[in-house]
Amino acid sequence: MLDFITETNNVWQNMRSCGLPLVLYGMGNGADAVLDRMAAEGLTAAGIFASDEFVRGQNFRGFKVEHYSDIKARLENFAVVIAFASELPEVISRFKALAAEHTVFAPHLPLYAGSEEVTNAWLEKYAGRLQNVYNKLADEQSRKVFANVLNYKLCGRPEYLWQCETDRTEDLTQLFTFGKEESYLDLGAYDGDTVREFLQLTGGSYKKITAVEADRRNYRKLCAKIEGLKNVQLVEAAVWDEDTELDFSDSGGRQSTLINAHKRKVRALKMDNLLQNEAVTYIKMDVEGAEKQALSGLKQHIRSGRPKMFIAAYHYDNDFFELPELLWQLCPEYKIYLRKHRYVPAWEMNFMAVYQGT
């Protein structure tokens, strides 16, 4: 077994053995998924509460949605099961306050149905590859994130995430060096938020920005927010390892995806073909589960230009080892860092790759 895995029971076993009523915090898709999985594991909820501003006497899945104070008055002691995702500072503070008073679980569920998830069997199956990536990561903080996140995904205790979080802007400025002639490729540009982040990192000076976004509503927002910037190429397309058409599900949010999509056909592009002979110095990649295909479609530019890269590492559990393995295959000289930024559950994890050759 892996020495850095200290947990032995999974989150569902921990819920069962805690001996406390299980109360969900949150409604919506996340709560649906948690309740379904609890039922499959033979677990039942004792109630549901929401933040006070969202309690309006409604029912959810047969439960009256209560205030936290109502739950406390009704139950002497209970465990809280966080059933929604957030990166908002005030919500994370609320999670931490609950954890100071109660046993708190934040179950990790795969983003995409049918994908592999972290279990004891998964850890045993991939132990060699996980250990190899762990050993090769660039610093101790990366290894701490790697270990903490895997322990969290197994046991469901969010404290593991809070103990290894760092600030995104500080990580970008400390691990990357940005000049005044950067050529930036933003894959999964959303509404332009990461273009604005790039402008802050470079003081507004750059050579070119290429921003790619497949979701129609997000693309319209991107165009509006980037209007007026010079040397910017906006591309409405998905990112893949070949030029083709793919099924795509629009959401108008961050979770627009190629995976299990049934809504419409979109143009998908191989970035080596889009860029042709154009150099790129910095790549941000958050393409909702298509990171492996996106990297494969950038082989030429990664091998020739060795750009610094910021790559989402949370869409699939197997991304934890498959993405760095692929990066090292394309460029063995990459130093790869792993950072966890503010979010519950284990989203906003990113590999940060820097070329360290001669």
Regions inferred by a protein language model and the residue ranges of each:
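Phosphate/nucleotide-binding beta-alpha loop and adjacent structural elements of enzyme active sites
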Residues: 1-46, 51-358
